[in-house]
């Protein structure tokens, strides 16, 4: 049976993640599909309930849901707890656990250029 993974956000039109994820699933031989689903702020609780009912393998959350999703989950991983926001929801043993890969991904890309330990930095961004 095909596993479903989705992006919940508003807006989601034009987001390239589904193209990348579906290509990666095919390359890895995984029977998964990644779909973009526009979910407004008021629809988020029902959308999380629907993902549970339909047995989604996981979700990505983008604006405006990264903080609002937290009380709708069964728990948080360390990264989401520290950052105070969720961008990934993983279904584990019937529970939805929030994670955050933004910080780890940023540091990994930065470490390819410099070692940030012990340095003061200025970070610019829009926070999405």
Kindly give the residue locations of the regions a language model identified.
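Glycine-rich Rossmann-fold phosphate-binding loop(s) that bind the pyrophosphate
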Residues: 10, 126-127
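Short acidic/polar capping segments at secondary-structure boundaries
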Residues: 102, 127-128
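Phosphate/diphosphate ligand-binding glycine-rich loop within oxidoreductases
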Residues: 2-114
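Conserved beta-strand elements of the Class I
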Residues: 6, 122-124
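Short helix-loop-beta connector
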Residues: 115-120
């Amino acid at each position: 049976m095909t596993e479903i993974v989705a992006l919940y956000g508003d807006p989601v039109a034009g987001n390239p993640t589904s193209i990348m994820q579906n290509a990666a699933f095919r390359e890895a031989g995984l029977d998964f599909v990644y779909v973009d689903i526009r979910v407004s702020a008021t629809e988020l609780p029902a959308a999380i309930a629907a993902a549970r009912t339909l047995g989604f393998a996981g979700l990505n959350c983008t604006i405006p849901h990264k903080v609002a999703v937290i009380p709708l989950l069964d728990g948080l991983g360390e990264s989401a707890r520290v950052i105070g926001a969720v961008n990934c929801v993983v279904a584990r043993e019937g529970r939805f656990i929030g994670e955050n890969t933004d910080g780890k991904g940023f540091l990994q890309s930065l470490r390819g250029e410099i070692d940030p330990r012990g340095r003061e930095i200025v970070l610019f961004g829009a926070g999405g």
